[in-house]
């Protein structure tokens, strides 16, 4: 039997006549910062944003605190309507007579109505400062007492005053809405 010559495997490669050349060290410029540095920068930016947001919210809360917190018009109507239905036309308040607060306070004392002076005052303020009440103040319109009887009519000066007051209240409501939006944002 003849043995066939098998190739011998070696770990060394034969060079093809080239002599190895010595190469210089290659310098690699890394333009991206390391991950820890990126993470640290992101955390610092996030902390700065949060600090700015909390400062803005605190400033908005401070600015919002100067406005009087009155009950809504519906709450004010529901507070006064059971005791003095003559002041209302359905659920809408009528124009109130001048000096009605003193009359209502005397009525509360006489009839022992469970309504504090503070609640009564706030309800009257909420009604008289509402947009629907101020819009109804036109020259010649009637003012009503607690029984629902006409006592006097609106003058031209009162109509002008109501229009100015309405502009002021709308401006304040717009500012309050902007401040509330700042407080509500995340």
Curated annotation (Swiss-Prot):
It holds the Pfam family ProQ. Residues 1-22 are annotated as: Disordered. InterPro entries: Fertility_inhibition_FinO_N, ProQ/FinO, ProQ/FinO_sf. GO terms for molecular function: RNA binding. SUPFAM superfamilies: FinO-like. Keywords: Conjugation, Plasmid, Repressor, RNA-binding, Transcription, Transcription regulation. Coiled coil: none annotated. Belongs to the FinO family. One of the components on the FinOP fertility inhibition complex, which inhibits the expression of traJ gene, which in turn regulates the expression of some 20 transfer genes. The transfer genes are responsible for the process, called conjugal transfer, in which DNA is transmitted from one bacterial host to another. RNA-binding that interacts with the traJ mRNA and its antisense RNA, finP, stabilizing finP against endonucleolytic degradation and facilitating sense-antisense RNA recognition. This is Fertility inhibition protein. It comes from Escherichia coli.
């Amino acid at each position: 039997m003849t043995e066939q010559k098998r190739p011998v495997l070696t770990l060394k490669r034969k060079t093809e006549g080239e002599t190895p050349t010595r190469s210089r060290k290659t310098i690699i410029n890394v333009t991206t910062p390391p991950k820890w540095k990126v993470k640290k920068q992101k955390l610092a930016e996030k902390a700065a944003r949060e600090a700015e947001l909390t400062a803005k919210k605190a400033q908005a809360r401070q600015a919002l605190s100067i406005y009087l917190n009155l009950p809504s018009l519906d709450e004010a109507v529901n507070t006064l309507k059971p005791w003095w239905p003559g002041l209302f036309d359905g659920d809408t308040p009528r124009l109130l007579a001048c000096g009605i607060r003193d009359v209502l306070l005397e009525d509360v004392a006489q009839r022992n109505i469970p309504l504090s002076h503070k609640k009564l005052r706030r309800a009257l303020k909420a009604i008289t400062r509402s947009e629907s009440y101020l819009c109804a103040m036109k020259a010649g319109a009637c003012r009503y007492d607690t029984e629902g009887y006409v006592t006097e009519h609106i003058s031209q000066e009162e109509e002008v005053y109501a229009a100015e007051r309405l502009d002021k209240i709308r401006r304040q409501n717009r500012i309050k809405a902007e401040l509330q939006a700042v407080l509500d944002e995340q």
